[in-house]
Amino acid sequence: MNQINIEIAYAFPERYYLKSFQVDEGITVQTAITQSGILSQFPEIDLSTNKIGIFSRPIKLTDVLKEGDRIEIYRPLLADPKEIRRKRAAEQAAAKDKEKGA
């Protein structure tokens, strides 16, 4: 069977993990992730909850890989972006009110 070259990436705030390797043509994303050994290196990765993509495009674990694909395993968000925006807007409004009152 023919081999294809792929990469797998997992990023942290201060560093990232990137591994290049060859897999059999026709392999699924999930099989490649398992074969890469990344799940034993980073036990916090849970394929049922972590989102997965190829070059920032969301994909399914059952998708078949192509030559040159880079599988990206995304960490869960630490905070809800909508909640952060709401909090920031409230803080800015409070600061403006304080300036007006001063």
Curated annotation (Swiss-Prot):
UniProt signal peptide: none
UniProt-listed Pfam families: Ub-RnfH
Superkingdom of the organism of origin: Bacteria
Gene3D superfamilies listed in its UniProt record: RnfH-like (3.10.20.280)
Cross-referenced InterPro entries: Mopterin_synth/thiamin_S_b, RnfH, RnfH_sf
Family: Belongs to the UPF0125 (RnfH) family.
HAMAP family: UPF0125_RnfH
NCBIfam families given in the database record: PRK01777.1
PANTHER family, alphabetized: UPF0125 PROTEIN RATB
Name of this protein: Protein RnfH
Source organism (scientific name): Haemophilus influenzae (strain 86-028NP)
